[in-house]
Amino acid sequence: MKRWQVCQDLRSSPFQEDALTDHYRILASLGQGGFGEVKLASHLLTQTKVAIKVLPKSNKNLLLKSEIEIMKSLDHPHIIKLLHIIDTNENIFIVLEHAVGGELLTRIEDFGYLPEEECNRLFRQMVLALQYCHQRGIIHRDIKPENILLDHKGNVKLSDFGLSTKIVMGQKLTTLCGTLPYCAPELFNLNGYDGQAIDVWSLGVVLYYMATGCLPFQGFTYQAIKQKILSGRYSVNFRLSPDLWDVIAKLLTVNPRERPRVHEILRFNWLKNENEVSPSSLGGNTDSHPDPTILVMMGDMGYEQGQIRESLRERKFDQVMATYLMLREKACSEDKSIKTPHPTQCAQTLKSTGSTTEKQTTLRRGSSLPTLTTFYLPSKLESLNKEKRTTMRHTMPPNLNCFNKSESLNKGRRTIVSHTISPTLNCFNKSESLNKGKRTIVRHTMPPKKTSPVRRICPRLHKSFGMGSASEDSSKRNSSDPSLTIFSSQSFMSAFKYGSTYSKRKAFLQCILHYHASQEEDQYKTTIIPSGKLNTTVPPNSLQEDQPTGHLHNVLTAGAVDNRNLQEKSPPFSTTATKGEGPAIKERESIPSSPRAPREQFRGRSQTPPRAPFRRRVWKTLKSGFLKGLGSLCCCLPIQKKVHPASNRVPPMK
């Protein structure tokens, strides 16, 4: 018998009945109340979180029917919403709206007390909810922070109507109920009391507790708290605004006849300046005008429109009505989140007592930062050439950028170097700036490689540029003369190590330019050498002593002339020549017949040849050599080890 009774109890357990589990899934327990347990559940169709209040059927719960009837008649945005009622043999399940913000008591305990601005907003919503109840003759009789919930937006939801009752106008109540610290003084009289007045007193206690964090009437015993309530004495040692103290003093008036009504509270100075409008009731069109959109959604779920309209009209609070109310609540919350606030609602913020002018500061946003850094590298002659501008853009900083002095001589020239990957070296030659109005753009997508395919055709290019000139002066060049040595294959390869293809071609042209300059110099210089005084010995400080005969001169890449080449053109006289023992050097009219004569004998003075014939001869040589070099680039020949004639130089006579 006992075993059967245990099984029957398990089967009739609230969370084992099919009437509940067919529509909801139990998630957790929210707490235990004075009349039953509250569970957190999820609606299976809409996935809406709800609170289920489990009330067992017994003779002790005489107010159960009254609470359900009162909850059915309430429909206000600041009152917890009744969604579904499930009646079984053992229990009654009341499905309510779930307030995710929790209790107001928890919020006050977490912060100690609430700011006056927030107290104003929350208290206004409490007054609106209580005014709605009093207009319908409903007395709550248990207003306290534990029964005031907050939703996800922080708005008030008045709950727990277990002690509430419905009265008619002028009816007196005699039942002593409520929570002691929030009870009004007239509750302790047995002559009866006004239900609306005790709710206003409880509102005053809640407002005091929100603004100060302390209860106005405290004591260690029941009699001590009762005496303080009857006397109406409370502490005022808190920094509150005078208007707020005025509201508290009027609400906590001991005489209930002098206590204001709920509709008069909104006319106080602390509240009347606010223009907040209470949201419209969520159930304003529940009975006669259902939302067509929600009807279509429920039709997709399998509900018939006639069934939906009947459930809403008769207010059955069954599964059909619960689904409709949940879908409507979701639709209303989404619409309110999209709407922009009205300008009048901005008055809820804290009013500043000081000056309204604020210092404006400029906010630096991350999006305002440039994606590519721009560097401006000016040259020395930039102040003279206003039209010239040199700009470099990098996604990665370059290692080295070299600009030549002569590149800024031409007005209007613009040199732009763009990189996507950091280059290793960028150099510009002196001869780059000879042509006016020329614009050079060098672009690198990858760093220059150490090895280049140009190595394979170096011998052919060297032959085309250095040995293949059609000029007559090319036959006069002697490889044994160290001052006329342009470069060997080794120096040729060193010239190609750095720079781009354009710079490499410029290196060839520079070498040819130096060669013809030396030839023109020999044509326009004459030296008178007396017979018998020709000194065939080499001066002791000649170039051959400083540099061995077999050593070859290196050609600088990217432009600048080496100091050693400058010394070759104008070296100092020997000591014997300065003492008169050497030859007297003058201008000569012809080139020496023997190419083996040492050039140290003619290093006294140099005369610059005329420009017109010099340029004609240079460009003639450049044109022929450049065309032959371009033809040689079309084929890639294997590397051939060719000995340059300059390496077979004959040492000068001593």
UniProtKB/Swiss-Prot annotation:
InterPro entries: Kinase-like_dom_sf, Prot_kinase_dom, Protein_kinase_ATP_BS, Ser/Thr_kinase_AS. Residues 342-369 have a biased composition (Polar residues). It is an enzyme of class 2 (transferase). SUPFAM superfamilies: Protein kinase-like (PK-like). Residues 336-369, 563-616 are annotated as: Disordered. GO terms for molecular function: ATP binding; protein serine kinase activity; protein serine/threonine kinase activity. SMART domains: S_TKc. May play a role in sperm motility, especially in the regulation of flagellar function. This is Sperm motility kinase. It comes from Rattus norvegicus (Rat).
